[in-house]
Each structure stands twice: as structure tokens, then as C-alpha cells.
């Protein structure tokens, strides 16, 4: 499958042949894409929510008042779950929210996400992702030529330092090395920009 190679100024500078088994899958499996996104988001959850049980609440163990004669319901501890400031029954505990997903499914999810963007005309191949200076204004002017609202940019093994610094203050723009390519960011951004080096790495990784 042949497609254009563009410059950062959105000018055609050449042509590249993409692997159709990675960038042009015939039937897009949205269910697989969703599974991978759910797996990613679950794994990203911190899981550090925690409440104290009766045994963990700090306080006295003394009986608050005598058993009979006060007119109140009998109480044995100020730390009981029904008391203000007492322990919490069946509250959240620190745990991992991660779920298991086979590597083959994760790989398929990335292939189908790339194919979906390619089919929509939102996956662009860029000849070079390098800037002479880390100027945000320069990069904003270049990205404006693509007329997109958000950009997920994937470079080769290493991201250009100036380019990375220039993206820091740009809303909804993210750049990662090829190892950081993931389904969630591909789907949530309007445009996906790939360097030629990234294409080679992804085709090798997903074949």
C-alpha cells in the first residue's frame, strides 16, 4: 500500500510503501481495540485507595458509657463502624486493578488502531521529526498546517530533544518513541504522525 511522505510543513516530499497487514486491515475489530484500551486504563489506575478498619482506627478501647440506665443503645467501643470517626466496614483496600490480556490481542489492537486511523486519512508519514530550536511557536505554526485538534506523534527509537521540548506546552499533542506507541493514545488523538523510522520499527514489531 503506497502513501505520501509529508514534511512538517504539510508538503509532499516522496512516497512510501506500507505493509497492508498492519496499516490496511480490511475489517476493523472495534471490540479488540476496546479490550486493549480497557486493559491499558485498568493497568494505569493507581489502586492506592484505602480506608481504616475498626482495628486500624486510633483511639481508646474503653467502653463509652455504662451498659444500662442511660437510655442510649448499648456501645462497646468508640471505634465501631456505627460511631462517628469509627472504622469503615468493607471499604476499599490498596490493590492492583490490572487485568490480564494475551500479547497477541494487544498486538492485534495496535494493528487495528493504526488501520482505523489510516482508513480515516488521519495517519500521516512525516520525513523528519526534528527541530533546530525547541520553539513551541514554530511547532504550533507547523502543526496548524494539518488543521487538526490533537496529535499523537511517534518517532523512532529516540525522540529529538528540541521537538520533545517544543511539544510540552501544546495542548493535546504528545510525542513518544516507537516503543511508546499504544492503542489508547492513537484512538484519543485526531491525527497520528509517524516518522519514516517509526514505520520501519512498527512493521518489524507487529509483523
From Swiss-Prot:
What does the entry give for GO biological process?
Answer: translation
Ranges for region Disordered: 50-76
Which terms are listed as keywords in the entry?
Ribonucleoprotein, Ribosomal protein, RNA-binding, rRNA-binding
Matches recorded under SUPFAM superfamilies? Ribosomal protein L4
Task: Say yes or no: keyword Magnesium present.
Answer: no
Gene Ontology molecular function terms on file: rRNA binding; structural constituent of ribosome
Question: Which Pfam families does this one have?
Answer: Ribosomal_L4
What Gene Ontology cellular-component terms does the record carry? ribonucleoprotein complex; ribosome
Q: What HAMAP family has UniProt attached to this entry?
A: Ribosomal_uL4_B
PANTHER family recorded: 50S RIBOSOMAL PROTEIN L4 (PTHR10746), LARGE RIBOSOMAL SUBUNIT PROTEIN UL4M (PTHR10746:SF6)
In the record, the note on similarity to other proteins reads:
Belongs to the universal ribosomal protein uL4 family.
Assembly and partners are described as: Part of the 50S ribosomal subunit.
Protein role = One of the primary rRNA binding proteins, this protein initially binds near the 5'-end of the 23S rRNA. It is important during the early stages of 50S assembly. It makes multiple contacts with different domains of the 23S rRNA in the assembled 50S subunit and ribosome.
Q: What is this protein called?
A: Large ribosomal subunit protein uL4
What is the species of this protein?
Answer: Rickettsia typhi (strain ATCC VR-144 / Wilmington)
The organism's lineage is:
Bacteria, Pseudomonadati, Pseudomonadota, Alphaproteobacteria, Rickettsiales
